[in-house]
Amino acid sequence: TQAGKHVSFLIVTDGRMGSVDPALFGDELVQIRQAESMKSAALLGVTDVTFLPFFDGGMYEMEQVACEIAKQIVRLKPDAVFAPDPNVISECHIDHIKTGLAAKMSMNMAPFASVMQSIGLEGSHAVKALAFYYTDKPNAYIGVLQTFSAREEALSLHKSQFDEKQVSDICMYFTLRSARLGLRRIQGFADGYRALSPTHMHCFPEASEWVR
């Protein structure tokens, strides 16, 4: 948002299954998580936040998530969609994996009016890029030196999910990762993304080798 771009957050799962307080879970935790998400988004300058109704913990069908993401793409008409990389070998968080896979699937749904009509929505929209974060194969880098402190502050607002030590540890990891990625492009701190254009998204396996 600092660069003048309009950003929308789409939160797929409701966070009901995990808290720093083991006695806090279920619907009560969902309400807290949503309030924390809104505060964190506002701090980052994001006012458009949508919550999907999927239970935390992966007990849902990935195809259902893809349909909902596709509907939001048609509604919001974004230039780019950002999602966790589902192809990282070490990633074991099922919600991250399913969300990333659903984002991939939605890329072949939202551009086609006939597909969207089959899931109950008129219209279509083709994004210009799908960018994966939490990736081990970045090919696009964005400098984050000017916004790095806001990331830590936004993370600290998720008090039901992270205690102070966890926030500190995560931010230390972010610092080390951003410094390492920044060195690749000689621009201080940077975030890395695995970015795909529409050309790369279908019947183009060489993109896995060439898009670097």
Map each language-model feature to its residues.
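Active-site rim/loop-helix segments in enzyme catalytic domains that contact anionic ligands
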Residues: T1-L76
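Metal-dependent de-N-acetylase/amidase catalytic core
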Residues: Y60-R212
